Amino acid sequence: MIQVLLVIICLAVFPYQGSCIILESGNVNDYEIVYPKKLIVLPTGAMNSPHPCCDPVTCKPKKGEHCISGPCCRNCKFMNSGTICKRARGDDMNDYCTGITPDCPRNPYKD
């Protein structure tokens, strides 16, 4: 729902330009939240996006790319499964990328 509202707001503010809203998700107290990370505004049909992964017309990853941003996204591709995306602190355990999403899932074995 938040994503749709952001796109509507963006289109209302920039009705004659294509834009790319990069959303980053996080987890706060077991509730999934989505918040804007960066707004890229380009003329409609622009061939070059300032973000190498973002298609400015569709606001999605460019053809052949997996992701735009996130702790498990590097150079427009998902990081390998098992890559540490969040280091352990205190009694906490490391969190690892899955290789199929740009998000860093919480370790299910945490207390």
From Swiss-Prot:
S-S bonds: 53-76, 67-73, 72-97, 85-104
GO CC annotation: extracellular region
Signal peptide from the UniProt entry: 1-20
Principal subcellular localisation of the protein: secreted
Residue ranges annotated as motif Cell attachment site: 89-91
Residue stretches making up the Disintegrin domain: 47-111
Family matches, as InterPro entries: Disintegrin_CS, Disintegrin_dom, Disintegrin_dom_sf
Propeptide: 21-47
Transmembrane segments: none
Superkingdom of origin: Eukaryota
Oligomeric and partner information: Heterodimer; disulfide-linked.
Similarity section: Belongs to the disintegrin family. Dimeric disintegrin subfamily.
Cited function: Inhibits ADP-induced platelet aggregation in human platelet-rich plasma (IC(50) is 8 uM).
Name of protein: Disintegrin DS-AN
